[in-house]
Amino acid sequence: LGTLSPLFVSNYASTQVREALARLPGVGEVQMFGARDYSMRIWLRPDRMNALNITTDDIAQALREQNVQGAAGQVGTPPVFNGQQQTLTINGIGRLSDAAGFGQIVVRSGERGQLVRLSDVATIELGARSYSSGAQLNGKDSAYLGIYPTPTANALQVATAVRAELTRLHARFPADLTWEVKFDTTRFVAATIKEIGVSLALTLMAVVVVVVSLFLQSWRATLIVALAIPVSLIGTFAVLYALGYSANTLSLFAIILALTMVVDDAIVVVESVETKMAEGLDRGSATAEALRQIAGPVIATTLVLLAVFVPVAMLPGIVGELYRQFAVTLSTAVTLSSVVALTLTPALCALLLRPRPQQPAAIWRGFNRGLDTVRDGYGRLVGRMNRRPWLALAATMAAAGVVVFSFITMPKGFLPQEDQGYFFASVQLPEAASLERTEAVMAQARELLLLNPAVEDVIQVSGFNILNGTSASNGGFISVMLKDWHQRPPLEAVMEKVQGQLMGLPEATIMTFAPPTLPGLGNASGFNLRILAQAGQSPAELEQVTHQVLRTANQYPQLSRVFTTWSSNVPQLTLTVDRDQAAR
């Protein structure tokens, strides 16, 4: 901030930055936390008003009449007298802009010309419209803008556009005013896509270079199989682009799984051609004969896989939305791999394959001996099982039982909790606690958080409850940005440590929670539990039952940090007017 006041910074961000960001393509909403816009604050003096017999309605009426922006009209417009030389627009004073101007508003005029001005019955100052909330970054007053993309927007593109726009706007910023992107949810998306890209490259190397080379033992055969991968993946991305999908975590995860599938059909074709060539056929005849024999099985295996993935793309509801891109990506990759195996792979076999030598190279002999040992052992095991069918049946039933038991006993959930690089803390003071008390407690919490080596930045917003989206002087929330993933422990470990430290602040209830795995699905991870008073119980009885539920829920090892922000003990003042005295 430097020499700039928090009020100026907040108002500048609201009027000069917020609207510019809201106009960017893909931006759905720009929300300002702790906003303090400029406003003329008029503090009435009841003693002076009573002495002059002036009411609040009189003052409100004077403000409405004398602080207006309206057209004053024109002079010299037709019909006019002959000889009119000019037509002029009349400009009035319009809306008032400073405290002195508001002080000159005439509230009442007397019969002898005496005037009662607003400054005679009120104290006027330029301040904020509301002081009920505030925002700070690492203890410094700041303007906190939250930017939410539209449902169909690409979050990474929106983040890039926002940074570019802020860079452009920075040239017009006053001195001592700067901007920083401290809370960036796309950092997790970018890191995830990067990790998927690394996994994609490693999978490609492991599957093609290592596994295929080990078993095919020919660089020509390995090259033919390897060429099937980029062709299938390029075709898959083309279909995804045509359908309006993007390269996101779901589609890229499906691509990784598809890598092992797109080479299956190509390997089958190459092995079949090599077998025919070993029988004495030339490359062209071997390819044609192999294709006649395996075309049907290749198509059949593709249809079996499609029978698994296509129905997933048709699931209704939010589950269907989540898995649709995943299923479409896999189905497309499998289909294209089958097409490649029946077209490109045979053509490459006819051009590149050579008959295998009678004796494999020395580098492969050790591997072949081990493979033969495993194959012979497996054959003997199958032979024994065939002679004892009841044993095979028992083993199959036991395996099925283990699967069913695991499915029943394994914990179930909609989506796993992700380490997105940040978490929240909800601060709740006793009901009717002032904003000053709330900010003092949040300052203590901030200092504790910044001492944690895993924490990078802390943004605090007082006077706003993030869980229910309401303004309250006794509440606030803290956004805790963590350092890079490889520089700190996992999210759950950091939250557990922080939660233990924050519980040492007795003035407030502070609960940490992770963000939802999918943006837009609530404000926190986990689930909500609603308690309904169906028999007309009082708020006090409902609160008692709620706390009983909380105590019981926190005893379960599967649950942690179960809490509520609701309370029935809200202190209030009751004003009783003595109507007889007021009428005198």
Residue ranges and their predicted role:
Residues 36, 49, 81-85, 136-140:
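Flexible, glycine/serine/threonine-rich loop segments and coil->beta-strand junctions
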Residues 49, 116, 123, 142-143:
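Short, isolated positions in well-ordered beta-strands
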Residues 37-50, 144-147, 528, 571-574:
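Short glycine/threonine-rich beta-strand-turn micro-motifs
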Residues 73-86, 207:
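Interdomain boundary/hinge elements
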